[in-house]
């Protein structure tokens, strides 16, 4: 099955690279978009939902209100208790000397059209961006950015101050990516996933796209500037009982490819360097690895049978490992031709 979004992105980039060979420049940047957690609460009945008649909370700033970061993607009434890892905005800008495009991904559940248009309208003319794509990873373990997951079914969980800051963060990431533009060479790969970490389609008809698609940008000396990875899975493997903000499987893939695969402080596999950008692919209804779907952690050599951070790590690192192995085995296609898109 073809991945339409990624095919269009590759087509556009390759068109630039072919027509203006030798002039390709790329810049990556990333920064945290993690909201501040102010008030603390205790989930007395352990249902991952805040009930003021049962659960306890501390008014840290003394304003008499429960200042929650409402988590998106699953049930209402799910305020964050802490931060597992930072959620990020990751940007890439690609310039062939004639055209310039920008892509920014944010570890959020979704972004409304009006919000995206406001970002495009705020882009300064001197950035010379011909097109900007703003993408949400569809993260189910981050803040509500669409108004569907607040303190009740009919109450928004969106914090307007956070959304204003998010807009600025996305623009700052783009600006930094432009500042980081440098000459680049591009290679690409279509990579099968490890069958020990299978993706499941939870609704009929059962149609699964199991491939990872990757674009790797490198310097003339061979060092990695950044990698753009596309894979179709719901970013939700910590699941609905999780009360810590996290970038989930997307974050583990990014850190694994860029920094290496770590368990605690032990480096088990070297990464490729640079910055990694995740684009969520075909996740329809409904590509995931459910809480009862077992996967195998090849680094810990054990089967994980429950949802949680360990499962997100195992799946994300498995994807990262596949990309790293493909690169180390010289199976990325250098300076790919447009005809490669037909496969």
Regions found by a protein language model. Name each.
Residues 16-21:
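Sec/Tat signal peptide C-region and signal peptidase I cleavage site
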Residues 22-136, 142-303, 307-314, 327, ...:
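Conserved beta-alpha junction segments in alpha/beta enzyme cores
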Residues 318-321, 339:
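Ordered core of a single globular domain
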Residues 1-5:
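Positively charged n-region of N-terminal signal peptides that target proteins for export
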């Amino acid at each position: 099955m073809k991945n339409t979004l990624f095919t269009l992105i590759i087509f556009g980039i390759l068109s630039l690279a072919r027509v203006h060979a030798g002039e390709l420049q790329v810049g990556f940047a990333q920064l945290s978009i993690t909201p501040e957690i102010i008030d603390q609460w205790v989930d007395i009945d352990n249902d991952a939902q805040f009930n003021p008649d049962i659960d306890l909370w501390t008014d840290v700033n003394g304003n008499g209100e429960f200042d929650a970061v409402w988590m998106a993607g699953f049930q209402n009434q799910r305020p964050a208790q802490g931060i597992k890892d930072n959620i990020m905005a990751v940007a890439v800008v690609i310039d062939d000397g004639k055209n310039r495009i920008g892509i920014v991904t944010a570890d959020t559940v979704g972004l409304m059209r009006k919000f995206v248009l406001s970002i495009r309208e705020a882009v300064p003319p001197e950035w010379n961006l011909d097109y900007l794509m703003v993408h949400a990873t569809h993260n189910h373990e981050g803040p509500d950015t669409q108004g569907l997951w607040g303190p009740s079914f009919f109450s928004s969980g969106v914090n307007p101050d956070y959304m204003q800051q998010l807009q600025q963060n996305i623009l700052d990431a783009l600006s930094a990516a432009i500042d980081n533009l440098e000459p680049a060479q591009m290679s690409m790969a279509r990579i099968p996933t490890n069958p020990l970490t299978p993706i499941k389609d939870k609704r009929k008809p059962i149609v699964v796209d199991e491939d990872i698609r990757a674009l790797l940008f490198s310097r003339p000396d061979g060092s990695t500037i950044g990698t753009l990875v596309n894979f179709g899975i719901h970013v939700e493997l910590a699941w609905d009982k999780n009360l810590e903000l996290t970038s989930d499987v997307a974050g583990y893939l990014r850190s694994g490819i860029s920094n290496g695969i770590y368990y605690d402080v032990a480096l088990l596999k070297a990464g490729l360097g640079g910055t990694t950008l995740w684009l969520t692919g075909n996740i329809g209804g409904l590509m995931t690895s459910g809480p009862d779907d077992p996967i195998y952690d090849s680094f810990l050599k054990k089967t994980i049978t429950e949802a949680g951070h360990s499962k997100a790590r195992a799946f994300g690192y498995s994807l990262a490992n596949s990309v790293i192995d493909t690169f180390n085995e010289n199976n990325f296609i250098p300076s790919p031709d447009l005809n490669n898109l037909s496969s």
